[in-house]
Swiss-Prot record:
Domain text: Comprises two domains: an N-terminal domain containing the nucleotidyltransferase activity and a C-terminal HD domain associated with both phosphodiesterase and phosphatase activities.
UniProt cofactor note: Magnesium is required for nucleotidyltransferase activity. Nickel for phosphatase activity.
Alphabetical list of HAMAP family matching this protein: CCA_bact_type1 (MF_01261)
Cofactor (UniProt): Mg(2+); Ni(2+)
Record has Cell inner membrane as a keyword: no
InterPro entries associated with the record: CCA_bact, HD/PDEase_dom, HD_domain, NT_sf, PolA_pol_head_dom, PolyA_RNA-bd, tRNA_CCA-adding_enzyme
Family matches, as SUPFAM superfamilies: Nucleotidyltransferase, Poly A polymerase C-terminal region-like
Function, as annotated: Catalyzes the addition and repair of the essential 3'-terminal CCA sequence in tRNAs without using a nucleic acid template. Adds these three nucleotides in the order of C, C, and A to the tRNA nucleotide-73, using CTP and ATP as substrates and producing inorganic pyrophosphate. tRNA 3'-terminal CCA addition is required both for tRNA processing and repair. Also involved in tRNA surveillance by mediating tandem CCA addition to generate a CCACCA at the 3' terminus of unstable tRNAs. While stable tRNAs receive only 3'-terminal CCA, unstable tRNAs are marked with CCACCA and rapidly degraded.
Family per similarity comment: Belongs to the tRNA nucleotidyltransferase/poly(A) polymerase family. Bacterial CCA-adding enzyme type 1 subfamily.
Catalytic activity: a tRNA precursor + 2 CTP + ATP = a tRNA with a 3' CCA end + 3 diphosphate; a tRNA with a 3' CCA end + 2 CTP + ATP = a tRNA with a 3' CCACCA end + 3 diphosphate
Name of this protein: Multifunctional CCA protein
């Protein structure tokens, strides 16, 4: 029985990156021998065991055979007769098909170390085409490694898989799992570039695919192309280290620009509402978590108002907070501001630009939330107000709190006073 370190841990060690979870393959053993040695069986589809002390995963070497379309259409074979080369041959990419033995010797039958040196993502063999999830994994690794290219033969194979309808059989949960992980990588734009290059983006996210080639006003967007802008926004979000809900909101904020009537281009009047309308079925189709979708919907509807809020007076600011439910959910509003700032910076030449809207909105919300709401309501009741009039009194008190805070003044008003 031989135990060897395999997969991502070997890859990351060779790259000099931090090694996360370590996966092991066991050659020359049976499930009964593993249990007898104290390993805890946990695998559902094939024999996987937890080490009795480290609790790391140890999987018996296996082969797999395609029996039906999609992600689940496989039959696995494990046994003491399955060799290490057999097991490595079923893996997706050469850089993930390496192993280290007990002595620290690298076993690399598919040239993974060479491809690491050349920064190339290359499939191991024809078995890659048997699992459509591997297209998503390939794209995710492109996002993680950033400057790695995809081998031409691998890209061609992915195109054939897409044309054969393999990605159409993917279950939504699996698509979201890989998409969400890719959004959290260092360069999310690379994931979408790879998916687009092989034709998978149009099948999986047609709402995003149609943004490429759609022009925007060059005075606002020097990069012009809406798809290019979206990629810049996603990479800005990654650079700023924001959370998954914020990154998904960035992904969905401009979907409506893909359906702008041609005769009004490059303007995009009303794209906010169209973005929200397209976002809802996309989130439902992918089974996106509620926290991600709700923030994305808010950002889609309100990002233009946030961008333009520098010209809002106190009353307009309070109305914005009303629409965003910022009184009850200030934390979500903060996430929306983060997404809007990524949007503003995700433009050619604006990557390091100041975004004064965010601090002003934070200050205005703090001022409005700082009033004693109970005292305002009690005073209103003492004046004989009730029903909707109580709500209006609270609304006016919030406006007054914002208007009286010097830090919340509009830049134009400050300039007049200073002049």
């Amino acid at each position: 029985m031989r135990c060897l370190l395999v997969g991502g841990a070997v890859r990351d060690q060779l790259l000099g990156r931090p090694v996360g979870d370590r996966d092991w393959v066991v050659v020359g053993a049976t499930p009964e021998q593993m249990v007898a040695a104290g390993y805890l069986p946990v695998g559902r589809d094939f024999p996987v065991f937890l080490h009795p002390r480290t609790h790391e995963e140890y999987a018996l070497a296996r082969t797999e055979r395609k029996t039906a379309p999609g992600y689940h259409g496989f039959v696995f074979h494990t046994g003491a007769d399955v060799s290490l080369d057999d097991d490595l041959a079923r893996r997706d990419l050469t850089i993930n098909a390496m192993a280290l033995d007990e002595a620290g010797t690298l076993i690399d039958p598919w040239g993974g170390r060479r491809d690491l040196a050349h920064k190339c993502l290359r499939h191991v063999g024809a078995a890659f085409a048997e699992d459509p999830v591997r297209i998503l994994r390939l794209a995710r690794f492109a996002a993680r490694l950033g400057d790695f290219s995809v081998a031409p033969e691998t890209l061609a194979l992915c195109r054939r898989m897409v044309e054969a309808g393999e990605v159409d059989a993917l279950v939504p949960e699996r698509v979201w799992q890989e998409l969400s992980r890719g959004l959290m990588e260092a360069r999310p734009s690379r994931m979408f570039e790879v998916l687009r290059d092989c034709g998978a983006l149009a099948r999986l996210l047609p709402e995003v695919e149609r943004l490429f080639g759609v022009p925007q006003r060059a005075d606002y967007h020097p990069e012009v192309d809406t798809g290019v802008h979206l990629m810049m926004v996603l990479d800005t979000a990654a650079q700023r280290g924001v959370s998954l809900p914020v990154r998904y909101a960035c992904l969905g904020h401009d979907l409506g620009k893909g359906t702008t009537p041609a005769h009004i281009l490059p303007r995009h009047i009303g794209h906010e509402g169209r973005s929200a309308a397209l976002l809802a079925p996309m989130s439902a189709r992918l089974k996106v978590p509620a926290a991600c979708h709700e923030l994305a919907d808010l950002v889609a509807r309100e990002h233009s108002n946030v961008h333009g809020s520098g010209n809002f007076d106190a009353a307009a600011l309070v109305r914005l907070f009303d629409r965003c439910d910022a009184w009850r959910r200030p934390e979500r509003f903060e996430l929306a501001l983060q997404a809007c700032e990524c949007d503003a910076r995700g433009r050619l030449g604006f990557e390091q630009a100041h975004y004064p809207q965010a601090p002003r909105l934070r200050q205005a919300l703090a001022a409005a939330r700082g009033i004693d709401a109970a005292a305002v309501m009690a005073s209103a009741r003492a004046r004989g107000l009730n029903g909707p009039a109580l709500g209006r009194a609270l609304h006016e008190a919030r406006i007054e709190a914002v208007a009286s805070d010097p830090a919340c003044q509009r830049p134009a008003d400050q300039a007049q006073q200073n002049g």
